[in-house]
């Protein structure tokens, strides 16, 4: 994604014809853009179908599919993940067709709006305005075409001025979706996705600054403490009576900003300060492995002792965002200090997510003692199940992230902060697919009024959105979070 390559800045290279990635076009390649974590034998026909589907998503749909609640459009995430997992064109097409009925059509304003975005004041005033999303996309496409991906990402995220600090905080908002967008752009080397990432970032609120910059200020005033493992910090938060009780069942979907930070920000900051990343290649590698390890461990171990297994929907985003950091830490055009800062912010965001879940007690035996329904199968079978599973893409993203974690964490196995062994990642992958595939059991599906309200079904939202709510537990450490899940003894043999 060099800033001087013809495929990134300026006009497309005529020698390459239509098969190139530009600010206006997606083009994947089995040889050049398979992704950091991928299966073998990727095919050109799948690359072309994935490219076409992501382009279709861009031309038709908004980054959100619900402007009021803020539900995200995951089609590009889904398709790109399926591409890396070796999906066939038909499998990717099926995923796209399954998800398109509940998307929000994108829209554009008068071309003059795009021109106005060049005015810094108008640019700032438009932040958070969903109606300007398409205009921000066009603005950033033009920026990338003129300057190159690296320069534009630096100028709008890493420059260090007031605007970029604001946008950088927004990058960590919305269950980390803007950060995930950035990860896809970098891992799959698509300038087009970089423009969409920046536009999506502009749509999100800046509330992460409340704890991210405040923690940096705390460290600046009090000195850098000795860095502790994320899981040790999480346990300290669970034992903190203010932090552990800061959220409750009455809090809404955006309980990080609306509940946790309002009630426990002062108490949270010292805990967050214990996650430190040194600007060295060794610490970048170790802490990248640690955020993968910790998020995978919490996803698998944050269970209810008397309920069937389920992964927490909010926490799984920490895992599916961590999958991109092996790529991010290798972007040498980003200063090593900034890469360390991004990783630090990611670890601290994961800790905030854990606190927002209600600091759930972790049960490692639910991982080590788990008996998969298809115990004799390995990664290839789990991947195949994820490729054909009909959802909005979260299941296959979790599976790919667990594959990545198994690989990246292996050099640190057995060290402090790394409780999972190599085989445990596959076990959690089995747990993931077993839990979401239970949707086929009629005894599992409990379409309660609470679920309908959460999914906005009452005002015309598609029924698949409420189905998404049923696949995963939410805010798993709070009272009532598991009420709609069967007890362990209720599970039918066929489930």
Curated annotation (Swiss-Prot):
InterPro entries: Questin_oxidase-like. Keywords: Oxidoreductase. It comes from the Eukaryota. GO terms for biological process: aflatoxin biosynthetic process. GO terms for molecular function: oxidoreductase activity. Its EC number is 1.-.-.-. Residues 1-22 are annotated as: Disordered. Disruption phenotype: Leads to the accumulation of versicolorin A. Pathway: Mycotoxin biosynthesis; aflatoxin biosynthesis. The keyword Signal does not apply. Belongs to the questin oxidase family. This is Oxidoreductase AflY. It comes from Aspergillus parasiticus (strain ATCC 56775 / NRRL 5862 / SRRC 143 / SU-1). The lineage of its organism: Eukaryota, Fungi, Dikarya, Ascomycota, Pezizomycotina. The gene is aflY.
């Amino acid at each position: 994604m060099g800033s001087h390559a013809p495929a990134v800045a300026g006009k497309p290279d005529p020698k390459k014809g239509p098969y190139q990635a530009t600010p206006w076009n997606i083009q994947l390649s089995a040889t050049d853009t398979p992704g950091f974590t991928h299966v073998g034998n990727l095919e050109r026909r799948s690359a072309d179908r994935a490219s076409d589907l992501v382009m279709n998503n861009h031309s038709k749909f908004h980054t959100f599919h619900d402007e009021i609640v803020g539900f995200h459009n995951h089609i590009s995430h889904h398709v790109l993940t399926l591409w890396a997992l070796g999906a066939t064109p038909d499998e990717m097409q099926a995923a796209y067709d399954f998800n398109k009925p509940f998307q929000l059509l994108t829209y554009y304003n008068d071309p003059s709006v795009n021109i106005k975005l060049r005015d810094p004041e108008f640019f700032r005033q438009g932040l958070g305005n969903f109606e300007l999303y398409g205009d921000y996309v066009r603005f950033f496409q033009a920026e990338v075409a003129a300057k190159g991906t690296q320069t534009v990402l630096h100028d709008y995220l890493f420059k260090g001025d007031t605007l970029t600090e604001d946008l950088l905080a927004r990058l960590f908002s919305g269950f980390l979706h803007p950060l995930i967008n950035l990860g896809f752009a970098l891992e799959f080397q698509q300038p087009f996705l970089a423009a969409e990432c920046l536009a999506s970032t502009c749509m999100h609120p800046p509330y992460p600054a409340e704890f991210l910059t405040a923690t940096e200020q705390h460290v600046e005033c009090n000195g850098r403490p000795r860095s502790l493992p994320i899981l040790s910090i999480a346990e300290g938060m669970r034992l903190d009576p203010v932090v552990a009780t800061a959220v409750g069942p009455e809090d809404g979907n955006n309980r990080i900003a609306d509940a946790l930070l309002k009630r426990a920000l002062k108490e949270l900051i010292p805990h967050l300060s214990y996650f430190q990343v040194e600007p060295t290649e060794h610490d970048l590698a170790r802490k990248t492995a640690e955020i993968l390890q910790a998020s995978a461990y919490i996803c698998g171990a944050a269970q209810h002792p008397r309920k069937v297994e389920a992964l927490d929907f909010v926490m799984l985003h920490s895992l599916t965002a961590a999958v991109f950091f092996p790529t991010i830490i290798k972007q040498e055009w980003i200063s090593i200090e900034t890469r360390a800062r991004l990783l630090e912010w990611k670890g601290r965001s994961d800790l905030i997510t854990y606190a927002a879940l209600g600091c759930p007690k972790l049960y490692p035996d639910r991982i080590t003692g788990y008996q998969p329904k298809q115990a004799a199968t390995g990664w290839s079978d789990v991947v195949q199940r994820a490729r054909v599973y009909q959802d909005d893409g979260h299941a296959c993203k979790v599976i790919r992230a667990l594959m990545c974690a198994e690989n990246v964490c292996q050099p640190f196995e057995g060290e402090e902060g790394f409780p999972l062994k190599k085989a445990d990642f596959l076990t959690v992958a089995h747990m993931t697919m077993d839990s979401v595939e239970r949707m086929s059991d009629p005894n599992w599906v409990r379409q309660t009024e609470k679920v309908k309200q959460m999914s906005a079904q009452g005002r015309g939202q598609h029924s698949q959105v409420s189905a998404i709510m049923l696949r995963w537990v939410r805010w798993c450490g709070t009272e009532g979070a598991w009420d709609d899940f069967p007890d362990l003894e209720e599970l039918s043999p066929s489930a």
